Amino acid sequence: DRQGSPRPAPPIRFQRWSQIALGAPVLLVLAFIYVPIAVIAVLSFQGPQGGATFPLRDSGTLWYQSLTDLTVITEHTDYLGQAVFDFRKSIVNSLKLAATTSVISTVIAMAAAQAMRTRFRGARITTYVILLGIVTPGLAISLGIVTLASELGIRAGLFTTGIIAHVVWTMPFSFLVIMVLFNRFDRRVEEAAYTLGASRLRAFFTVTLPMMKPAVIGSLLFAFMLSFDEYAHSIFIMGSDRTLPLTLVSAVQLRITPSIF
């Protein structure tokens, strides 16, 4: 009777080939993602006579030294000597927008996730509506917000149409991050707090929120990175305000220098 006997282990040679077959596609994907980033990092050490060419014609740290020269890094000038691109202001705008967006998205996502836990009628449809911001094209969202703002007489800007578009984009991701931890949350801890006389509000701030701290931090960081690097949701909605991605794209269209890398 061999039904209870263990199966023989596969040959060592077969194990090695299976590891190679599984590992090769993973290595190709990682190379596809990270090799262009490595090339850009190497090009940043291009010499003064080199441009966006590989391999390097010369090497040096000239373009890193130019980061301390505000006339070089913060202003590209046209033939009249007028400032065209202000990188310093663009960086500040991106930091302000990303920080504000991350906080607002996390607060809204936390409230939405808390509501989803009650399993009310229509909760599944509401979840799909919340996640629409992920699958909707950024240009469509931007154009819709700008059109609505124009009808309402709201001026397009960083903290008007800009913040709305970025919250619409980042909030679904924050919602998913928070819901992952909520699905593993032990409700008995909250029920114990209610039994001891804590109100729902007090139980949330003293029990639920501390236990959700990893999800809150992850949501803040995720939303910040998405907002800071976002271009499609910013192209039509910033008005005269410029974020770093918008300024970088405009600068690259005019001239590519290793300082941009």
Give, region by region, the residue ranges found by the protein language model.
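Transmembrane-helix boundary motif in ABC transporter permease subunits
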Residues: 1, 9-15, 96-130, 143, ...
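Transmembrane alpha-helices
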Residues: 24-27, 32-35, 167, 175-179, ...
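Hydrophobic positions within alpha-helical transmembrane segments of bacterial inner-membrane proteins
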Residues: 31, 35, 98-114, 139, ...
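Interhelical loop and adjacent transmembrane-helix boundary motif
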Residues: 13-19, 51, 61-75, 228-261
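Membrane-interfacial helix termini and adjacent extracytoplasmic/periplasmic loops
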Residues: 7-12, 54-55, 84-85, 122-124, ...
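Periplasmic/extracellular loop-to-transmembrane helix junction in inner-membrane transport proteins
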Residues: 49-101, 253-254
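N-terminal signal-anchor/first transmembrane alpha helix
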Residues: 1-43
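A structural signal for multi-pass alpha-helical bundles of membrane permease subunits
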Residues: 34-49, 90-93, 142-154, 162, ...
